[in-house]
Amino acid sequence: MVKKKSKFRHISIGKKKYYFYKIVWYDILADGSHASATEFDNMKPALMTTMGYIYKKNKKCVWSFASYDDETFSDRNVFPIGCIK
């Protein structure tokens, strides 16, 4: 018998489940050099993609991680909600 795949991909650490997400977000673009007004007008934030597990979230931020063991988390990020597409 083939086990049906779960609708949601998750892991369990301790007694808590962490769900896997694709997070699309805007990264700040900075440039310390001299530039014309046209070059400045053409600057845009980079659209980034992060794949990982959601550790927690609130109204201001989302915490994520991509690597883990039985007790610790690594490849961690904290995204301000306003940066997430």
Please provide the spans of the model-predicted regions.
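Conserved RNA-binding domains used in RNP assembly and mRNA/RNA metabolism
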Residues: V2-K85
